[in-house]
């Protein structure tokens, strides 16, 4: 293609409302243009990238024997009511009525629709297992869409749904999809990690997320320095410290700490490090007998709410106790609470349970205890893992130390079990001709988010550096003064025609622009292989080549150039 035939909408200015680099570069490179909050037009360059991402996904899904179909974006609300998610999903589900006053929603996901289809079309166990997928537009009415297409309201997803007679069959397909996703993201050229994850609002029994590692990511990923172990920080297990707890050497002493309510205030006042202080938080309990519960973690650690709410004594969903509830249960403000002489259940983190001679609140405003020790001064109701892991913790797999990086979630796979099939009564006849509820799996990839994530991982101060597999064009040709030199024009067109005849995607910059403008645009839009042809090079019988990741260009003899370029395109 020639730039004269392409909507090349590059800009030099960085929009003020674009915070993350992918949003900035997608706007500057003419990949997208905003329409309304969280809604974007995809321009021709962007669509070329999208189609390449989709093609890789489609190829791998087809190889995995998944069947492509297409379901409506508009969904009848009665299916959401039947599944029980009509209210549970919340305001992100955009609802509306048609002219007949029937209620519909714009689909953020398609579990209900595919389950309804399967219960109508699949009758016998002989038709299973079956795995269906689509690449379709979704809509989620985000309250604050941000980061461009990273968190937009309208987006494109590949979502797949598998159906099974038993959990063993589901497990096999789940493992197949896990392997398929690894192949997809590898082919996309991304540095990613599959991580153990929480099932969230989708529900189900087992889950993995696939994260592209990038500093702009919204999720913290914990992974081992010496193995393949990786997990969302919400699920990564914090192991108990090894060895015996140190013996008590101090007496329990109450000290005055006037107006010192935060860990920082107490540590500054008492000249202590945070790891010497036990932080006590009061949360809502799960029973009438214990309406509030105390959680104790070390002062330098953060509470993990996901882990905490899975405990029997803690209310689900997780919620902090109110000031009034704390005052009624303990008799002081939140910043003065401690486990000593506490009349409510005390759940202690594994690491906090290893502390000796620690400082904690005295359950009296303006006072703390020093020299506190477990068993002697306070007895835990339960010791459990309730904190986030931190860098340097031993890896739960037993190999290496925990490292933590930011990640952008681009894929998620779930073992749903029978959550939706039971709610919608999706059954088939088993070998005994009896109706049996189906087991389900769910497998999603954010197609538009993949594009943004690829940029977050591949850019420099000049613009985008696309992974080869998803670049809008493989090669760009930048002629020097082509419109003034028939010789240059002939050489350029000859090479352009030869490359396109070989099926290579070439962008020829045939604009009447200064060379600097053309160079800047080609680097901004991130085409991997750049060719420059000019009078000076032709005089020497050479063609200039530069890869987008290289600092310097190379001059290649004309006679050798095609073989050289084909080698570069094949990765040699």
Swiss-Prot record:
Matching entries from Pfam families are given as: HGTP_anticodon, tRNA-synt_2b, tRNA_edit
Q: Does the keyword Repeat apply?
A: no
The family annotation for this protein states:
Belongs to the class-II aminoacyl-tRNA synthetase family. ProS type 1 subfamily.
**Keywords, ordered alphabetically:** Aminoacyl-tRNA synthetase, ATP-binding, Cytoplasm, Ligase, Nucleotide-binding, Protein biosynthesis
Q: What is its main location?
A: cytoplasm
Provide the protein name.
Proline--tRNA ligase
PANTHER family listed in its UniProt record: MITOCHONDRIAL RIBOSOME PROTEIN L39/PROLYL-TRNA LIGASE FAMILY MEMBER (PTHR42753), PROLINE--TRNA LIGASE (PTHR42753:SF2)
GO CC annotations, alphabetized: cytosol
Q: List the disulfide bonds.
A: none
Tell me a GO biological process for this protein: prolyl-tRNA aminoacylation
Gene3D superfamilies, per the entry: Anticodon-binding domain (3.40.50.800), Bira Bifunctional Protein, Domain 2 (3.30.930.10), YbaK/aminoacyl-tRNA synthetase-associated domain (3.90.960.10)
Q: Main EC class of this protein?
A: ligase
What does the protein in this record do?
Catalyzes the attachment of proline to tRNA(Pro) in a two-step reaction: proline is first activated by ATP to form Pro-AMP and then transferred to the acceptor end of tRNA(Pro). As ProRS can inadvertently accommodate and process non-cognate amino acids such as alanine and cysteine, to avoid such errors it has two additional distinct editing activities against alanine. One activity is designated as 'pretransfer' editing and involves the tRNA(Pro)-independent hydrolysis of activated Ala-AMP.
Top-rank lineage group of the source organism: Bacteria
Q: Which Gene Ontology molecular-function terms are recorded?
A: aminoacyl-tRNA deacylase activity; ATP binding; proline-tRNA ligase activity
Q: What is known of its domains?
A: Consists of three domains: the N-terminal catalytic domain, the editing domain and the C-terminal anticodon-binding domain.
Its subunit composition reads: Homodimer.
Q: Where in the cell is it found?
A: Cytoplasm
Give the EC number(s) listed in the UniProt record: 6.1.1.15
Which reaction is catalysed here?
tRNA(Pro) + L-proline + ATP = L-prolyl-tRNA(Pro) + AMP + diphosphate
**What InterPro entries does the annotation carry?**
aa-tRNA-synt_IIb (IPR002314), aa-tRNA-synth_II (IPR006195), aa-tRNA-synth_II/BPL/LPL (IPR045864), Anticodon-bd (IPR004154), Anticodon-bd_dom_sf (IPR036621), Pro-tRNA-ligase_IIa (IPR002316), Pro-tRNA-synth_IIa_bac-type (IPR004500), Pro-tRNA-Synthase_IIa_type1 (IPR023717)
Originating organism: Hydrogenovibrio crunogenus (strain DSM 25203 / XCL-2) (Thiomicrospira crunogena)
